[in-house]
Amino acid sequence: GIIYSTHKHKPEAPRLRLVIPLSRSVMAEEYVAIARKVAEEIDIEMFDDTTYEPNRLMYWPSTSKDGVYVYRELHGDLLNPDSVLARYKNWHDVSEYPVSSRQTKIVQHMMQKQKDPLTKNNLIGAFCQAYDIPSAIGSFLNEVYEPTASPDRYSYIPADSVAGVVVYENKFMYSHHATDPASGMLLNSFDAVRVHRFGNLDGESVTVTETTKLPSYKAMCEFAAADGEVKKVLLQMREA
């Protein structure tokens, strides 16, 4: 393996990358499981939480003119992915994956930052009132997600891993499945359906930071406005 410093590395604030060669190529889901298990055995709190994303862009090592560059070679055999995966009871089960203490706090912070979708007096709020996360999945995304033995977890059907979707208070969902288009996003039921049913419309618009300017948002609004259950909630809102 190799350890080298990033451009922002300082002796008083070290920032290092660890490269571990594997004995075979791995799929995206395998990489996530392997990376998390290796990090856990070293100290998962030392690793940035983006470490486990399979689509990582790695830059050539560099350092500032007055910086300190660190480079170390670690000699040994190539890491066997299968031996790491075998350390799980079932590596396909995402609920077994080790996480840092920060990750739980991040999701909690995201929930606090996002407005309760049920309190929104608009089309989004009406959709979220008509369909909580479980009912939205059952009604519109049953070919995308399937329930697990745990009521607050779902599996992304195309993935090799299972139980990677966590439901919070039936209002939000967060997918840990690496290949899920909704991976890494805290979504209410409106946005969960938007991402999967109309996300392909966004194309080059993925760089747009305001969701309301995305083609998928417009399409989802039209879809929601035409739904009978949503119409009932909108009528109740107007009469309130």
Q: Can you describe what each PLM-predicted range is?
A:
Residues 164-169:
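Short linker/helix segments within small regulatory modules
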Residues 170-239:
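Short, small/acidic-rich helices and loops at N termini and domain boundaries
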Residues 8, 64-65, 158, 177-178, ...:
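Short, flexible beta-strand-to-coil junctions
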Residues 138-163:
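Short, charged low-complexity linear segments at domain edges
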Residues 2-4, 19, 58-61, 154-157, ...:
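Residues in well-ordered beta-strands of folded domains
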Residues 10-11, 27, 163, 182-183:
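Eukaryotic short linear interaction motifs
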Residues 1-10, 45-50, 162-163:
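Catalytic micro-motifs at enzyme active sites that drive phosphoryl/nucleotidyl and oxygen chemistry
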Residues 15, 20-146, 170-173, 179-180, ...:
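DNA replication initiation modules
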